[in-house]
């Protein structure tokens, strides 16, 4: 019985130790030992959870895949292409914590280009050549769909615009220096040094390392 009583006493003491409070230094009404860090940003969510507020007022917490500098800028991105259609980010190595997004310079809802951004939007800063100069470009020019220098969220490429093609950082459907829409280009699908997606070479109009070049070589073999 004595052993049992001692065990019960130890259990009670251990429980008291576990439940001992650590204070509420953040005045959030919850004990600090529970992991609560307060709500310094007054966004209604405890700061320990990764919430950092919504200083840009775009409806997304700045810690959670947001940049606190106006992700969905009024009026276009925030209301037309913000949470309503779920267009957030489309994957870019330039931005950490971006599940989706074309990146810091270009793309849908981005800082320097895309659908509705501080330097982008429906026909913006320098993109109004011919009256329909791109859905939000800084220099995205003659027709582009939203970038710094053109394209669907690209630095130097994009959907039929100043420097070519559907685009990526330097061109293409997910290509660095080639593909549909590249540096150089002739608008439309864009030609990286006259090639449908590759590092390009002038002689054959397709690009030495491109799909077009490969198809052309195959056609040559048939004759």
Curated annotation (Swiss-Prot):
GO cellular-component term (any): extracellular region
Subcellular location as annotated: Secreted
Top-level taxon: Eukaryota
Signal sequence, renumbered to the chain: 1-19
Keywords: Secreted, Signal
Tissue: Prismatic layer of shell (at protein level).
UniProt keyword Secreted present: yes
Protein's name according to its UniProt entry: Shematrin-like protein 2
Originating organism: Margaritifera margaritifera
